[in-house]
Every structure is written in C-alpha cells, then in structure tokens.
Amino acid sequence: MTDKLIIFDTTLRDGEQSPGASMTRDEKLRIARQLERLKVDVIEAGFAASSNGDFECVKAIAEVVKDSTICSLARANDRDISRAAEALKPANSGRLHLFLATSALHMEKKLRMTPDQVFEQARLSVRFARNLMADIEFSPEDGYRSDPDFLCRVIEAVINEGATTINVPDTVGYAIPELYGNFIRNLRERIPNSDKAVWSVHCHNDLGMAVANSLAGVKIGGARQVECTINGLGERAGNCSLEEVVMAVKTRKDYFGLDIGIDTQQILAASRLVSQTTGFVVQPNKAVVGANAFAHASGIHQDGVLKARDTYEIMRAEDVGWSANKIVLGKLSGRNAFKQRLQELGVAMESETDINNAFIKFKDLADRKSEIFDEDILALVSDESVTHSNEQYGFVSLSQHSETGERPQACVIFTVAGKEVKGESDGNGPVDASLKAIETHVKSGAEMVLYSVNAISGSTESQGEVTVRLQNSGRVVNGVGSDPDIVVASAKAYLSALNKLQSKADRVAAQG
C-alpha cells in the first residue's frame, strides 16, 4: 500500500518574497483558484499578521477556496497566532504555520534569546495555537543548521503540545541531498513521539539543489510533505519547484512508491499564470514547463520520437497541460469557442461580464493578428484580470510619431482615479517618450530597475509581453503588459507597476 505525499504550495507567501514579485489581492485570488484546480493539498495564502493587506488576502482566499487547506504563517507569539486564526475563520480547512529560529546563529544574532528561552516560546506558542485550531505546523527556522540535540528537544516538546506537522527548513539552501535526507531520518529516529506528526521539508535553491534535497528528505528521511512554489519562485535563488518535484514523484513512482493528488494537467496553466502575474519569465529550458521541455532538435531524437515516443520522452507533454494544437482561434471564432478554449486552458473568469470583456479584447486582437495562440489568450485574460475599476491608473490609448533623426513624440491618454488625462512628451525612443508622457501627470519619482520584452508566440505578428520593475522608497514592484504594439505593451506595464506601488503605499499608510 502506497503513502500519499502532501503538496504544500507557498507561492503566495514565500514565492512573493522574490524582489518585484508582490501581487495584488485580486492577483493572489486568481492564483489561489488555479492552485485549487491543480488540487494542491495546502495553500499558504500569506502572513496574516504582517500587514492589513496580507490579513485581507488570507481571509479572502479562505472564503473562496474550499477544496484545499488554507494556511497562514505566524511568528511564535500570541498576537501573530490570533491574527492568523482570525483570518482563517472562513476556511473549510485551516492551518496555522508557526515558525521560530533554532540555529545558534539566529538565536544569538537575530532573536537575542537563549536556547532555553526559545524552547519555552516554541512550546507555549504551539499550546496557544492548538487552543484555536486543530491543524498546527511548526517550523524551526534554519533547522538544518541547528544543533541536532537542541532541535530534537524542541520538536519533541512541540509535538507534545499538539503540533501535527513538523517542517524542517533548509532556510539558506546549504544542504546536500544525502546529508539532508539523513538529517531528517536521524531526527525522526531520535525523537520518541516523531510518529505523532507528519514530517515536512522546505528547501531553498541557493546551490541549485532545492528539488534534489526535497526528494532526498522524502525518500531517505521519510518526509510526507513537500513545501514548494510554482516555477520555483522565491527570494534569492528561489524555492523547490512544485512542477519538478511533482513530476519526479509521479514519473518515478517505481522508486518513491508514493501517491500524489495533483491534477498534473493544470501544471502549465499554473506556471503561465504565475509568470504573467509576476513578470518572471520561465526560462526555455526549464524542466516540465519551459518552452523547450518537450522539444527535440536532434534528427536522431526526432526520428526516435516519431517511431515511439518513449524513446526520448519520459513523460507526455499533454500530462502537464501542453497542447499539441498551437493555433486555436481566429477572427471568425465565436464567443462559445473562446469560452471553451478558456476552460481547456484552465482559466476561470469571475463572471459572464468578465468573459464578455475578454472576448471583446480577443476580437480586437484577432483583427490585428491573423493567428491566435494559447499564449495570446492567456496574456489577454491576464491583462483583463489585473484591470480593475478601483485602480488608480488605467490605460486608454496611445499615439506616437517618430522619424529618422528626430526625437520621437508620444501622447498617452490614461485614467487617474477614474478621470481621463492626456500626457505628451518626447524621448530617446518611442517607449521612453510614452513613459515620460505618463510621468507628466503621475510624477512618481520611481526608478526603473528592469525593462524586458518577451515575444509571446514565435512570429513577427506576436504579441509582446513587457515587464517593468520599479523601485521607490524601498518598495520594488513588477508590472506586466501585453499588446502586438510593444510601445502600448510598455505603457500598460508601466501603469500596472505604478498601480502596485500605489497599492503598497496605501497599505503602509493604513497601518500608520
């Protein structure tokens, strides 16, 4: 009889800590719904006590997602725990995730606490949390670099107080697979009550081994939960990649002997959604979800695949959501065909009004572009989903003029708090002129630290997807915009980033 491996997704919490990856409430809700369609077991929706905005995000996700356990991170203190429990009240199934550093370095330099003080705080915080909720996870932060004797003492105590999941993080990505797997196994063997909790792994990718370490924690250490993110999103070099660990366990069931509840056909839709929302482009050679993941350039390989797919393919592209039919719709396609394709791509719009608005944009795109690809549709609905009436800035139209030897001129019409304004400027190029035209009214003072363009599909007709990263007063945000006209896509991306900066500033102001 096989065991089940629990998939704990932390894209919305740990993944969002990647510089520029901050998401709005509506963007988080859309990703949470996709994670639910993916059949993720546990969704870490945020850190409820960190801000009013995060509290509202966790609460909103708990209200709408009913088929996954919703989790909030909390420091090991009564205030954080109470705040997280309050945000999780609407959840069908909720989990409190408590963390407290246990390595000598963190206790001395960060917490400025003695080991005995940390031990008591860990024990009492779990006791307090257990009075509020039955499902309690405890993470000894920097656990892999902690003294094993002290770690055993802490973990035994928190299990006695009611912790149901023990997560051992490799917080700085220092571990090596065999050593990490043995570390988990030794803890489980030494702690008398280790069988009273599910053991979990949480690995960072600083040395490029987050997935390998996680799998070693499962196979060697006996862990039955993996904490991971879509596309491996996360601070520094990222986290364990959900799609990679899931497909490794599923493809090599002969080795791992574990069941997994993930609907793998939703993996690609989740990857694209996270990429388009955050502006972090997936590298072409990324395992499972990269554009080249199932491409065969070698003539020998192509011949083998045509004769028998399993000569060079260990998993089927369609099993993770890739479609063999790339060209899907055109200008004569109707609303029902458009709606059906959205469903096939795993996209759920909020209402019929949203579908109608997206369809109008689709028809406009089809008038300008003869062949509409899946990537075009996903970019289009992503643009539609991040445009809301309550946003400070909204794109309306753009015109620009340039001749060889002259500075380009641009005129951008956009909304500020619902009112249309017109900005005009020249610049070093049409993009520069357009963004300067926006700044004639906004005067954000933000510094652009990244500007990148990605072709959504592979032709000169392709839509361009532009990512703009802005930095202001210590806040870093990404904005994403798409359009067949790169200048228009740039203006949309810039306004998107400005909206996120405004949203962050509003949250800070609300907290006083």
UniProtKB/Swiss-Prot annotation:
E.C. number: 2.3.3.13
Residues annotated for Mn(2+) binding in this entry: 14, 202, 204, 239
Domain of life: Bacteria
GO terms under biological process: L-leucine biosynthetic process
Reactions that this protein is recorded to catalyse: 3-methyl-2-oxobutanoate + acetyl-CoA + H2O = (2S)-2-isopropylmalate + CoA + H(+)
GO cellular component terms listed in the entry, alphabetical order: cytosol
CDD domains, per database record: DRE_TIM_IPMS
Self-association and partners: Homodimer.
Protein name: 2-isopropylmalate synthase
Source organism per UniProt: Polaromonas naphthalenivorans (strain CJ2)
Record gene name: leuA
